[in-house]
Amino acid sequence: MKLLAVKVECSHELEDGLSFFMQDELDAQGIESRKRSDFVAEGQKHDSSLVELDDIENLPKDLELTAYFNYENADKKELVKKITDKIAEMKGYGLNTGEVSISTKEVADEDWNTAWQKYYHVIDFSRHLAIVPEWEDYHPAFSDQKLIRLDPGLAFGTGGHTTTQLVLLAMERALVKPMSVLDIGTGSGILAIAASKLGASHVLGTDISDEAVTAAKENIALNDVNNINVRKANLLKDIDDKYDLIVANILADILLELIPDLDSHLNKEGKVIFSGIDYLQLPKVEKALAENNFEIKMKMQEGRWIGLLIARKPD
Amino acid sequence: MKLLAVKVECSHELEDGLSFFMQDELDAQGIESRKRSDFVAEGQKHDSSLVELDDIENLPKDLELTAYFNYENADKKELVKKITDKIAEMKGYGLNTGEVSISTKEVADEDWNTAWQKYYHVIDFSRHLAIVPEWEDYHPAFSDQKLIRLDPGLAFGTGGHTTTQLVLLAMERALVKPMSVLDIGTGSGILAIAASKLGASHVLGTDISDEAVTAAKENIALNDVNNINVRKANLLKDIDDKYDLIVANILADILLELIPDLDSHLNKEGKVIFSGIDYLQLPKVEKALAENNFEIKMKMQEGRWIGLLIARKPD
């Protein structure tokens, strides 16, 4: 299979938003991110006098995001236009886009399949959680660290995204007993797997995309867990049960659609975790939560991204 | 020993700030907090039709904070004046003080020693951490939850304060390998104990107060840990070593004093956790961090309180 590679050079401020957009909206098969700051940080880990940044081949000016599309279905001109429009929209939010350039290239799938693996490594997320690519041999510093095995090429949620990480942290806080968990927009299944490893009694992961449902099932099979179900569903519309914990890592506008249906799907003393919220969109999410009788227990922010731990207001 | 009990009735918004003030600045021996919302929440855990709030004796209107002082040393009039001034100051920050009333009462120490215990219970803080009063028999839902044993009457840091909890969460995130940890203003020693239980290689806890140093040592002795030292020190002034992780849960003005000395006490790739910051004071902390070449990796907020996970800026 041939692939179309679309390379966007721009400011690192666009990384999360643009990755999200290209994977979720434009159906990219996979995304590579090369950031100047990663090379700088990597250099600092060694004796810095030995690492000359100028010697690195094609060192990115700031951020280089390369998205891979199925060549047969991809409309090159339209993709470039949509990405250009998205960047203009993000600029409208007040983000610094940097000097933007977009280029395209035709590549053989084989190249990509091996090439992108080198950009995914173990994410030593926290004291008790690490995300480990399927092919990596990893020896945790603490033997009781829980490992989430993932084929990060499969769907959104490689563990590297800030929005995913904010949910992981909030789950470590909230999951103090065996709870039932609903993961809306499960993507790669990473959050469903994490919930199970943390001790959820059972987990349902849902996604509107067939590809995500398949990917989540494949990732779940890589992990030693047996209490996760995955099925196709559009937010809470086809869900009948109630849960102790509902997590949703999707964009703010979709969270807004979800909020009115939360109460009827949440057990007594249930909690909700939201992520995927740009800080500029926080006020409207806060307003909708308050109007629906929810309150924010804890707010987490990394860069522009906000995650929320939410509960019903006390009467 | 006789005690002077000073009871402040006011809005729950003052709870953390006023507790901090009375314990740290006015040297209260202990503080009891009774909040209407706690009784409401407790009622909801049972069949709510059976719990009638009106039946509860002396149900607080909103918040009742009772601080206990050594009767011999306490100047009743001056204490009331200082608390009144503090509340006026907090009102100036924009807090809702509610209807404030302050009353004093003389009590026998024996009454208090038994009375306050009923206000401290297990804090099921997170999936992997719980704070357990010395006298409680606790069976965690997850057998690998790490327990911090505490005599919460001893010094500041009972585990119930938001500011303490934000540090606990940030430590769960940051302590991904055996690190050396410095806990500045250790109080009860709770954060030093947590760091050790999470797998720190060694921990130094410091406090400017002799009472806190004694209390921390007593609490450490309740826990099965052997790599914590505690000593009296004024912030970083008497500290020579460098650490992988520095935590400081103290008020914003004291954090500002600390910031210029951080760099020289932090190992390469070291991290810093700050808590005790009222959100109105965040801008000046952010400014001082930026001026000293630090950046905020993650911001956590609960109510008015902010906690920060901090690292050096990449070059």
Swiss-Prot record, chains A, B:
Keyword Methyltransferase listed: yes
Coiled coil: none
Catalysed reaction, written as an equation: L-lysyl-[protein] + 3 S-adenosyl-L-methionine = N(6),N(6),N(6)-trimethyl-L-lysyl-[protein] + 3 S-adenosyl-L-homocysteine + 3 H(+)
Cytoplasm is among the record's keywords: yes
Molecular function GO labels: protein-lysine N-methyltransferase activity
Predominant location: cytoplasm
Keyword annotations: Cytoplasm, Methyltransferase, S-adenosyl-L-methionine, Transferase
InterPro entries cross-referenced by the UniProt entry: Ribosomal_L11_MeTrfase_PrmA, Ribosomal_PrmA_MeTrfase, SAM-dependent_MTases_sf
One GO cellular component term noted in the UniProt record for this chain: cytoplasm
EC number of the protein: 2.1.1.-
Localisation: Cytoplasm
UniProt binding sites for S-adenosyl-L-methionine: 164, 185, 207, 249
Record-level GO BP terms: methylation
HAMAP family per record: Methyltr_PrmA
Family: Belongs to the methyltransferase superfamily. PrmA family.
Stated role: Methylates ribosomal protein L11.
Protein name: Ribosomal protein L11 methyltransferase
Lineage: Bacteria, Bacillati, Bacillota, Bacilli, Lactobacillales
Gene: prmA
